[in-house]
Amino acid sequence: MDISGSKVLLTGATGGIGSALAGRLTAQGARLTVSGRREEALKAAADAWGARTVLADLAVRSDVVGLADSCADADVLIANAALPASGDLMDYTEEQLDRALDVNLRAPVLLSQLLSAHMVARGRGHIVLVGSISGKAATKSTSLYNATKFGLRGFALALRQELRGTGVGVSLVQPGFVRDAGMFAATGAAPPKGIRTVTPGQVADGVVRAVHRDRCEVNVAPLELRLLSAVAGQFPGFAERIQARADLDGSVRQIVEAQRSHR
């Protein structure tokens, strides 16, 4: 699908990956709408890219429905917004748990449902769900985050089959460890030894490629991480033993403590 001239709704536009996406989409000639819950940051992003803005908290059901209503004419949905959701499950309050599930899983599912109905009626559209390699492999102290990303992956792959033949494509883009954005940039923690990182720009390129080529799944990660995640998905017990031997507890604690305030 050609992005040029298409109306694109981008959620999570104020973060590192979101900013890179906004830049790529604008360069491709998209008619961009960005959404977020922080008005000042959203306005800055809109000013930078000449985008329309819709203020919405994706943890609030009425805001999600309102966002879909205001963007009913969108040709492309890029569901990029997500909370980090790191930490042991027992450390979460019920409210924090609900918020992570709402933002990371329920909101993209609901937006996809509401907007795809209009896309199917027009016989044209594309939905991109930005997941994570954490949707393929489980790691310690990310049980809630893994749950949302595993769920998003299953949803995306099944929805693609449901919409086959309607003119509406569905793609899942799964970044690996991203430098200059996300948990490593926010916490100062180092990625595991021997694992390379990717840039927000590479993730944005993966999203654009997914739309242009109607790709089912795009894994934006170096070869070693793609192989490790594939093995972990097939042999979780083996992956658990490898992670235990890697002695990642210090890095994990650093990430969890730094992200606690973002729940």
Regions found by a protein language model. Name each.
Residues M90, T139-S143:
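Active-site loop immediately N-terminal to the catalytic Tyr-X3-Lys motif
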Residues S132:
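Residue(s) in the substrate-gating loop at a strand-loop-helix junction
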Residues S112, T148:
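Active-site helix of classical SDR
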Residues D88-L89, T93-L101:
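Substrate-binding pocket helix/loop in short-chain dehydrogenase/reductase
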